[in-house]
Amino acid sequence: MKAICRLTLMTIMALVPKAMNADLSSDSLAYHDASTLPLLGTLAPDASNAYTRLPDSLKANMRPELWALGQNSAGLAVRFRSDASTIGAAWYSRNKFDMNHMTATGIRGLDLYVLDNNGHWTTMGSARPNFFRHNTRTIVMTDMEPKMREYMLYLSLYDGVDSLYIGTNEGALVLAPEAATPRRANPVIMYGTSILQGGCATRPGMCHTNIIERMIDYEVINLGFSGNAKLDLDIARLIASTPNPSVIVLDPLPNLKTPELVERMPEFYSIIRKAHPTTPILFVESPIFPLMRFNTETYDTITEKNAALRQLVNGFIAAGDKNIEYFEGKNVLGDDPETTVDNYHLTDLGFVGFAQRLAPVIQRLIKQ
């Protein structure tokens, strides 16, 4: 968990982010500025950078590491419809970041989904990033019947997007969506670590927050911060200021030591609960990682943290909170040892299993 954070921050802090434009030159596609289209997954619709997760007002006082990670576009998705027969994208990756245990497509690629005739989102294809440059222009699908379709384009998980254009064949339309899916009025907010940010999905659509979004048909706000889910009160206040969330999921344990959890969680929770007195809050234990079968120190550390969270939550319930749900760590990955890349960060298999177990709980809380 520490390695992914260290690599991320070394890269982000070494580069001064500048608003750069995608390269649209000498290409057979016509390009449409995606900033004019609805953007899902952001709590900063009026930010100076269109594709950020955090409002500008937080920058001055927020920890620099946390702010930098907030410029990663995890969980962001552009919604549109088009009658294109060929569709692609052009975008500028803010940092051109790479890691040795996660694909470039997951880190800084894009992932295109289409709404099928049954109203389900299905993958169409990934936009793989240029290995050598910040700029990428690529075609995702060609030779389609030119009819109107609804699309959702997931953005990069571990890099930022400075500019983005939808590419189509000449004469094709790119318009705002007609289908109201996913539902946006009452988003699900999920806060957590590098796992929640999407480490190490092979492509953006395979992060469990994005899978859950498609499964439950509700917008999901991804507040995953690699190595930095430290229960910063700035994040608690941001969640508190979000109108009408349907469910709030708190999943920060892998980034916390037990004393930090015990000291910080009560105030973090109380800020959110004061603003949203009846919104269901779902507390998620640390996963029971595969290496815990062998590494006794890790087993003891995680078991202690999970027990501390259970005690805190029991206290909140005893104080009268009837809108709390608890998700045990053994249910995150189940019994399958093939669910991680490095004993911590999830494979696509791990993300699918996690989503399949967590989504029904969230859906029940929404209906409740």
Where are the predicted features?
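Sec-dependent signal peptide recognition
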Residues: 2-10
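Glycine- and acidic-residue-enriched helix-capping/strand-helix junction motifs
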Residues: 99-102, 198-206, 299-303
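Histidine-centered active-site loop/cap adjacent to the catalytic His
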Residues: 342-368
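Oxyanion-hole/transition-state-stabilizing segment in secreted/luminal serine hydrolases
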Residues: 200, 204, 212, 230-275, ...
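Short helix-loop-beta junction
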Residues: 209-222, 314
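Catalytic nucleophile-elbow at a beta strand-turn-alpha helix junction centered on a G-D-S/GDSL motif
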Residues: 185-209
